[in-house]
Amino acid sequence: MKEKEKIIVAMSGGVDSAVAAGLLMEAGYDVIGVNLRTWEYEAPACDTTKKSCCSPEDIRDARDVGLSLNIPFYVIKMEKVFGERVIDRFISDYKDGRTPNPCVECNTFVKFGALFEQAKKLGIDKIATGHYARVIEVDGRYAIRNAVDMKKNQTYYLYGLSQDNIKNTVFPLGEMDKSEVREIAKRMGLPVAEKPESQEICFIPENDYRSFLKKKGMEFTPGFFKLASGQIIGKHQGKEGFTIGQRKGLGIAWKNPLYVLSIEDDGTVVLGEEEETVSESFVLEEITYQALAPLALGQSMEMKVQIRYRSAPVHCKVTSLGETWKVNFLEDVKSVTPGQSATFYPTNGDYLFAGGIIQKGSITRKIKSNVEVQRESVPI
């Protein structure tokens, strides 16, 4: 009798990874379930009424799924790599005026990078997750392809995977929509069939990142609000509490809504009206290539770019500067944010060419200043 192929399934305690494990069992794999313990949780973060992920409650749910499926289940301690790769960068990015994307870092270095290292120690080549994505091979290179359910599509968070990791990853849910996954969970009798989806950053209770940063000892840098023209219009208590494109919570009275245009090292937060948020270009750094082979210095190419998870890709032209790209938009795009990820796709394709980080200080805007100063409204 042929021995079943072993596969490790990363089980978060949610319905998606539970169904992924069940489907692989039905497909004939020898499934081993693992949960990655990434964070030492304080009591408030363990409130089971909150829709977070990776909490002690989620570990219990993942273990219950393992019992229900009758598969081996293990908890792997990942606090060290998670702290170094995800939390440390999260803190340093905010301190430096960038807006981080911890889920990208976690996928790249923990859920796939570190987990593959553990799998290889056990002599296991393949892992699977409950991500909504697919794998495609293009001209001898591997890439993440959009899921069928575009409302759940997660390719944006997976651009950092290496060629070897993509090749050896299975995404059982890539061809399904969420409602179908729920029905399969009910058919399988899984205890998490009706569990709500996670909606928070796992280590940020209540999504209050400012309180988290303060607990980590970060000192906020107070400074001035000013317009792109240079006119000072107010004060704030810390640049670390703002992000590019932010409109709410500024505390500035103005005839039209103001948005954060940039955050300067000296603590200055530059504001402008909505039309001033439109960007012309930016520089991409920390590039990971997937279907696209590395571009030669000076080589240009038109493609599509996505600058945030919920936004639609837009047309752009990229030019290789060596280790970075110059990205010029061919359509209007608002509030390009340094520190966030940008993913790239063929103009007529549904798979990843490449991805990287939007470089701080590299963003050019179409309109430099369009706000008339209202001296009577300046709360200094």
From Swiss-Prot:
Keywords associated with the record: ATP-binding, Cytoplasm, Disulfide bond, Nucleotide-binding, RNA-binding, Transferase, tRNA processing, tRNA-binding
Q: What is its EC number?
A: 2.8.1.13
**Residue numbers annotated as active site:** 106 (nucleophile), 202 (cysteine persulfide intermediate)
Q: Which family does it belong to?
A: Belongs to the MnmA/TRMU family.
Which named protein is this? Answer: tRNA-specific 2-thiouridylase MnmA
Q: Per the record, what are the reactions this protein catalyses?
A: S-sulfanyl-L-cysteinyl-[protein] + uridine(34) in tRNA + AH2 + ATP = 2-thiouridine(34) in tRNA + L-cysteinyl-[protein] + A + AMP + diphosphate + H(+)
Q: Which GO terms describe its biological process?
A: tRNA wobble position uridine thiolation
Q: Tell me the classification of the organism that encodes this protein.
A: Bacteria, Pseudomonadati, Spirochaetota, Spirochaetia, Leptospirales
